A protein has these predicted regions:
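Mature extracytoplasmic enzyme cores
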Residues: 1-181, 188-189, 193-195
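Anion (oxyanion) recognition and catalysis
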Residues: 200, 204
């Protein structure tokens, strides 16, 4: 609660917008729901799917715009969860300070001897949740963090947020999008750097 930026985040890609007073079009208001947790609006899209619910086209639009006739309007939100953000180095720095440094304060003299290691139970990003089927109108859950789009764009030269639909549906062309690989590659690397490298360095420096 004191440091919400250190809490784990998820990206919710949903057909049903959150009703917080900011919705503009009547169509959005009619299909809206109350949010279950703290969140921030990220983007919305005009999505065109074919008869097999494969992705034909998409474009990022504003909240005030409706999707074109025959298309669907989808929304993306960043939500906060209760676990530490394992893709954010600052969050893991704080985690180390309130756990590992306390262990060191009390038992540091035994590090490398009777205390050979410190156990952390299954550190992980938020579990992914896909659509149940391609024409499903529920929500997709994906790992996310505040600056993911910024670091993604810096590494790959393309915006993740501008192209979210290609993570959700198969392309009608049958050609896989490299953005899917980029997304999984980048989130995995962010996790490895923020958690594994960070805690590994501390352990090496402290003889465990």
């Amino acid at each position: 609660k004191e440091n919400p930026e250190n809490r784990r985040k998820l990206l919710c890609f949903t057909y049903t917008p959150y009703d917080d007073g900011t919705l503009i079009t009547e169509a959005d208001k009619e299909k809206s729901k109350k949010p279950n947790s703290e969140y921030a609006f990220l983007a919305c899209f005009d999505v065109e799917l074919d008869s097999q619910s494969k992705l034909v086209s998409y474009k990022r639009i504003s909240l005030s715009e409706n999707a074109a006739e025959g298309h669907e309007k989808w929304f993306a939100y960043m939500e906060y969860a209760g676990y530490a953000d394992v893709m954010r180095k600052e969050a893991i720095d704080t985690f180390i300070n309130i756990t590992h440094e306390k262990y060191k304060q009390w038992f540091g003299g035994e590090f490398g001897e009777s205390v050979p290691t410190i156990f952390t139970d299954e550190p992980q990003m938020i579990p992914k949740k896909p659509l149940e089927h391609a024409c499903d109108k529920s929500s997709v859950i994906l790992p996310y963090t505040n600056d993911l789009d910024e670091t993604f764009k810096k590494k790959y030269g393309i915006s993740l947020l501008d192209n979210l639909p290609v993570l959700i549906w198969e392309n009608a062309s049958g050609i896989p999008s490299p953005l899917r690989y980029y997304y999984h590659d980048h989130t995995t690397e962010r996790f490895a750097e923020a958690f594994g490298d960070n805690i590994g360095k501390w352990c090496e420096e402290n003889n465990i």
